From Swiss-Prot:
Disulfide bonding pattern of the chain: C163-C206
Family designation: Belongs to the BPI/LBP/Plunc superfamily. Plunc family.
Keywords: Disulfide bond, Secreted, Signal
Tissue specificity: Parotid glands.
Signal peptide: 1-19
Record's keyword annotation contains Disulfide bond: yes
Family annotation (Gene3D superfamilies): Bactericidal permeability-increasing protein, domain 1 (3.15.10.10)
Gene source species: Bos taurus
Gene Ontology CC: extracellular region; secretory granule
GO molecular function: lipopolysaccharide binding
Record-annotated membrane-spanning stretches: none
Listed name of the protein: Short palate, lung and nasal epithelium carcinoma-associated protein 2B
InterPro entries in the cross-refs: Bactericidal_perm-incr_a/b_dom, BPI_fold-antibacterial, Lipid-bd_serum_glycop_N
């Protein structure tokens, strides 16, 4: 049950009589996050870089003759993204947890190119000063880019496309609101979460994703593209 003083404060906020506290809070959150992203989130948690290097090694091993379970790569991805969001939670008060990466896929578009997708799901809780936790959300966001092999030169080169960051592609579903059906409060929470996630995608996740793919040599990328073509050809007609 919401305490009476919180309801009084809430009414003041919605009426615009409390100096637009949620707006100030939102801007302050984004300033702190921007500063953290500029410094590098691994300066707050050195484990991020360790996990990232392990992930690079694991993905490279998928291109070798060794048998490596794809699930191992996904586990490192989950560990990496979870650590990143833990730092974000400390900086912003927007708590992002229970991160899951169902898979990482290479979808061949030609013999030398593919779309690469990393779908991410997580639980989000947004807190505001004085009001505390205001809304729980379900997060779905896809990291998407392209990778190709340029064969015009003597040594084939790996070319990685832009990692898309469209805030509207970030899906946030309301699971529970501490203030019932007060839409303005829910909107504040959803919009703040969207801006935080969008900033993290642009400033941390996409650069990591790009660096991960650029670390692979042309032979490795060619093999990953070939594996995706084989998988597509083996799918039953009705499952496509």
């Amino acid at each position: 049950m919401v305490q009476l003083w919180k309801l009084v404060l809430l009414c003041g906020l919605l009426a615009g009589t409390s100096a637009s506290l949620p707006d100030i809070r939102g801007n302050d959150v984004l300033r702190k996050l921007k500063s953290g992203l500029e410094r590098g989130l691994d300066t707050f948690d050195s484990t991020i870089e360790i996990i990232f290097q392990n992930l690079k090694t694991e993905l490279e091993s998928r291109c070798s003759d060794e048998v490596v379970e794809q699930q191992e790569t996904e586990n490192f991805l989950e560990q990496l993204i979870s650590r990143i969001f833990q730092v974000v939670s400390r900086l912003t008060g927007v708590r992002i947890r229970n991160v899951q990466v169902p898979d990482i896929t290479f979808e061949a578009t030609s013999e030398n190119s593919a779309n690469v997708l990393i779908p991410i799901t997580a639980d989000v809780t947004v807190s505001l000063p004085f009001l505390g936790e205001i809304v729980d959300l379900d997060l779905n966001v896809d990291l998407q880019t392209t990778v190709s092999i340029e064969t015009d030169t003597e040594d084939p080169q790996v070319v990685v496309g832009e990692c898309t960051n469209n805030p509207e592609s970030i899906s946030l579903t309301v699971l529970h609101s501490r203030f019932g059906l007060v839409n303005d409060v829910v909107d504040i929470g959803v919009n703040l979460a969207r801006r935080v996630v969008s900033s993290v995608v642009e400033g941390e996740l996409c650069p990591r994703f790009r660096e991960l793919l650029e670390s692979l040599d042309a032979e490795c990328v060619e093999k990953l593209i070939g594996e995706s073509q084989d998988t597509t050809q083996q799918e039953p007609e009705g499952s496509r």
